[in-house]
Amino acid sequence: MAQTQADTAARKPVGQSVSATRRVSRLRRHARLRKRIAGTQQRPRLVVHRSARHIHVQLVNDANGTTVAAASSIETDVRGLDGDKKARSVRVGQLIAERAKAAGIDTVVFDRGGYTYGGRIAALADAARENGLKF
């Protein structure tokens, strides 16, 4: 039986850093989440990745493994925004909703990536919902 990254990461050595422990826990949560959800062509998966500085989001069709649309806080129109990271997350949520509409998608499956639903993740999700995505 092949071991996944989450399985091997679950066996943490004594004295592991707090950030490493949090990363391992997030990977385990994401692995559990991914067992239950998958994106299709009509209803792709809205995948969120959050770093300390940026947030990235993709619409993924898991049936053929393609990315339908993507948005990120690294893009020039988002980088120029005044405000905090949450304001940038709201703008990224608006962008992904616009790009999903342009691709003919109105319903998605939300994959929070193992992150807790709050702060920047919730702000992105709420902005995407307000701009027409259903999930």
Curated annotation (Swiss-Prot):
<dbReference type="InterPro" id="IPR004389">
    <property type="entry name" value="Ribosomal_uL18_bac-type"/>
</dbReference>
<keyword id="KW-0689">Ribosomal protein</keyword>
<comment type="subunit">
    <text>Part of the 50S ribosomal subunit; part of the 5S rRNA/L5/L18/L25 subcomplex. Contacts the 5S and 23S rRNAs.</text>
</comment>
<dbReference type="GO" id="GO:0006412">
    <property type="term" value="P:translation"/>
</dbReference>
<protein>
    <recommendedName>
        <fullName>Large ribosomal subunit protein uL18</fullName>
    </recommendedName>
</protein>
<feature type="region of interest" description="Disordered">
    <location>
        <begin position="1"/>
        <end position="23"/>
    </location>
</feature>
<keyword id="KW-0699">rRNA-binding</keyword>
<dbReference type="InterPro" id="IPR005484">
    <property type="entry name" value="Ribosomal_uL18_bac/euk"/>
</dbReference>
<keyword id="KW-0687">Ribonucleoprotein</keyword>
<dbReference type="GO" id="GO:0003735">
    <property type="term" value="F:structural constituent of ribosome"/>
</dbReference>
<dbReference type="Pfam" id="PF00861">
    <property type="entry name" value="Ribosomal_L18p"/>
</dbReference>
<comment type="similarity">
    <text>Belongs to the universal ribosomal protein uL18 family.</text>
</comment>
<dbReference type="GO" id="GO:0022625">
    <property type="term" value="C:cytosolic large ribosomal subunit"/>
</dbReference>
<comment type="function">
    <text>This is one of the proteins that bind and probably mediate the attachment of the 5S RNA into the large ribosomal subunit, where it forms part of the central protuberance.</text>
</comment>
<dbReference type="GO" id="GO:0008097">
    <property type="term" value="F:5S rRNA binding"/>
</dbReference>
<keyword id="KW-0694">RNA-binding</keyword>
